[in-house]
């Protein structure tokens, strides 16, 4: 059983000074020690909450959330993270704001940020748009702070864009670290990031891209498996290849789900839309081509239906390492005969892994809180120490 001091000591050995007053866009833009700092602070905050130690580092302030796509886990994880640190959350509903009347990104970003310490954005639907929008928001608030309009520049946390889903993948990784007993035990472990059938179309690429972009940094043997025609962004594949070369791991693409699952230590079967189709979809929306969008949707649904055999079955799970691979999913999963007739995973597999799946999801609030804390405090180790010394209980009578 670790103590809070153990986490503080570990934090003091890491170099993460560039995270202070900075933003979190993509995991591969961060150093290994910066990622380690996020996991360490996340674990420290979890330890504190579980041991009734207050983690309130803000007496006031706002966490602004903007979701341009549906969300349950990430929405509540962001709200939980802000609350954990003492911030209140205000959700920006663009449909009810002046954005609907043509307000510029620069103006909106500054107007919502007068007392904001963090802005969390999900914008994952359109290739080439989401991450770019987040940078535009950061540029606006940076200039606002420089011009003396804003007292402080709120940090931005990417809650999922068109390229990466860093809070999800960092939470996934922290779950893996705990399941395998430390980062040092991950080298050589086989992870299968595989496409799986879904009766819906247009699921973002950011989860598989985020997974291969992060897991390849751990010296793991990462296999990206999908039917032909379901490629991810080529630049992310290149990131994964370079990571694998640097860490002594491996990265390869397979068009065989069974090949990916064979002897795998970790499996992550999840549906996504082809990069080429998502790119075409973005262009059709930009052109206002509603008929073209409908046609593309029919084509993609028909294409998906050709690959219903890409499902995480009991038989496939038996072929994994000792038949006991760790099953991951960002949730919600398409479960056979539960949420749909045919989907990503058989019900018996999902039911067997339900508890670890929920545990996997539970890391996300702490990961987000850690990202915020590392961006807002120059010496988070000292902040954690002072919180412990105050001896204020989170819940006290």
Task: Describe the predicted segments one by one.
Residues 1-76, 80:
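Positively charged, low-complexity intrinsically disordered leader regions
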Residues 147-154, 220, 319-328:
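A short helix->loop->beta-strand "cap" motif at the edges of active sites that frequently abuts
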Residues 56-177, 335:
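Phosphate/diphosphate ligand-binding glycine-rich loop within oxidoreductases
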Residues 395-397:
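Conserved small/polar residues in nucleotide/adenosyl-binding loops
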Residues 68-80, 177-291:
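Glycine-rich phosphate/diphosphate-binding loop of Rossmann-like nucleotide-binding domains
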